[in-house]
Curated annotation (Swiss-Prot):
Taxonomic lineage of the native organism: Bacteria, Pseudomonadati, Bacteroidota, Flavobacteriia, Flavobacteriales
GO BP terms: translation
Main function: Involved in the binding of tRNA to the ribosomes.
Gene Ontology molecular function, alphabetical: structural constituent of ribosome; tRNA binding
Family membership noted in the UniProt record: Belongs to the universal ribosomal protein uS10 family.
Pfam family, one: Ribosomal_S10
InterPro entries on file: Ribosomal_uS10, Ribosomal_uS10_CS, Ribosomal_uS10_dom, Ribosomal_uS10_dom_sf
Protein name: Small ribosomal subunit protein uS10
Keyword annotations: Ribonucleoprotein, Ribosomal protein
GO cellular component, one term: ribosome
Amino acid sequence: MSQKIRIKLKSYDHMLVDKSAEKIVKTVKTTGAVVTGPIPLPTHKKLFTVLRSPHVNKKAREQFEVMSYKRLIDIYSSSSKTIDALMKLELPSGVEVEIKV
């Protein structure tokens, strides 16, 4: 059952993404599978511009930004033990996990 598993992690907090990636890599390595990563993917920055005043002063604006951080982990030569370990793994609620087999 040797197959490639690709895990993408996405979050607004880079510390959560790094901790989750570290946890996944450590868990997979204990099962004996080969891991590449975590590979940092480009950071996406979304910028919001709003008026400071609700009525006048178009020149007075404020900008807010939301950064999303992504990491990629590839797992090779995985076994059923690896998949079971990944299913039981508890990750923080602020991390979005996408798994492709």
